[in-house]
Amino acid sequence: MNIFIDNKSGAPIYEQIFTQLKSQIISGTLPSDEALPSIRSLAKDLRISVVTTKRAYDELEKEGFTVTIHGK
C-alpha cells in the first residue's frame, strides 16, 4: 500500500489519505480481505497526527469501504 502526502496540495491530509485508500480499494490494488495498517502505525509512517489518520479511516468506514473490528 502506497500513500503519498502532498503538502502543497490544497486538499486536507485526511482527504488525501481517504481518496488514495478509496481508489486502491475500488481498483483492487488493496484486496478487500486485507487489513489496513493500524491508525498509529500509518500516522507514524506518514509522520502525521493520529487524529488525522483516524479521520481518514472514519470517512472510509462512513462511506462503507471499511469496517472496524475491535481487538484485532
Language-model features: where?
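Short, Lys/Arg-rich nucleic-acid/phosphate-binding segment
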Residues: L36, T68-K72
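Short secondary-structure boundary/capping segments
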Residues: I5, F65-T66
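A short alpha-helical element within helix-turn-helix/winged-helix DNA-binding domains
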Residues: A35-L46, L60
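Extreme N-terminal segment that seeds HTH/winged-HTH DNA-binding domains in transcriptional regulators
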Residues: M1-A35, S41
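Short hinge/loop at the helix->beta-strand junction immediately C-terminal to the helix-turn-helix recognition helix
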Residues: T29-L30, E59, G64-F65
